């Protein structure tokens, strides 16, 4: 499958798209599901854990998330494709570092809800309600922000927490910070 181009904030036209609010998906079609699969492939190739449609230039309310297998804790890989996601409930607070494929070379500290309930549509167009917590809740909130034109840098706890990392290593640095900083929540 052909990889999609991931938009970055360095390009003014890309930034305009990234700052735009996405439209609701009218119908979950086979073509749209194939596009979501293409997004997953692109995200995997970029070593990401989440990708929202605006990050590949499509202003529709769709994101994909995939948490890698955690052999140490015997957790299988978790893959999510969600259309028209909406946070309907949240509680608790966690502080942690986030990176973004659209902001290469940086991570920053962001406060998010510890647990959220999200309504949306699955790949069959069926309504789903997901209750997620911890790191997965952080990733879902980050991707839903993209659908509203919000970048994680808009939510930094303090601008001084934005720090450079090797380009392409944002997600790895974020995962490392999450595993070391579980007590940060």
Task: Give the ranges of each region predicted by the language model.
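Positively charged
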Residues: 1-185
